[in-house]
Amino acid sequence: MTKPDKSSQPSIAKGNPSTAGNTRVFVDGSTRSYAALRTAAIGFGTYKPGWRWSLHARSQMGKDSENHIGYIISGHMMVKDPSGNEAEIEPGCAFEIAPGSDAWVIGDEPCIALDFIPIRDHSVSQ
């Protein structure tokens, strides 16, 4: 995705990730969509029980995971950093995950999460 020309944009930007036409469907049927605003993109992910970055996203994305900043709306996610440290992220938690980490849904309900990407770092492949 190219950087938007901010000089021609209004001072207020809005978008709906579910209608922005930027949705990725992972091999297990989980989805992640985003809306690009002026300086950041807001992602909305619905990850099914059993979804795991290393199994359902890495090969499709063609790269290791990148830094992620987000917020869990519902469901639970377990994250393992490159050093082997693990943390459960539950509803209501904001998080920042280091590049090279793995993450997976735990429990029987989907994990619904927002993520926030500065436009300078955002690419379509995310």
Task: Please describe what each predicted stretch is.
Residues 29, 50, 84-86:
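Detector for glycine-centered tight turns/loop "hinges" at secondary-structure junctions
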Residues 82-100:
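Short acidic-glycine-tyrosine-enriched beta hairpin
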Residues 1-46, 54, 59-60:
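A short, N-terminal "cap"/entry segment at the start of jelly-roll beta-barrel domains
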Residues 45-47, 70, 95:
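Conserved GNAT-family N-acetyltransferase fold
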Residues 52-53, 75-80, 103:
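Short beta-strand segments in beta-sandwich/barrel cores
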Residues 98-124:
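Ligand-binding loop in jelly-roll beta-barrel domains
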Residues 62-79:
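Short, conserved beta-strand element in jelly-roll/cupin
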Residues 43, 85-87, 112:
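Short beta-strand segments
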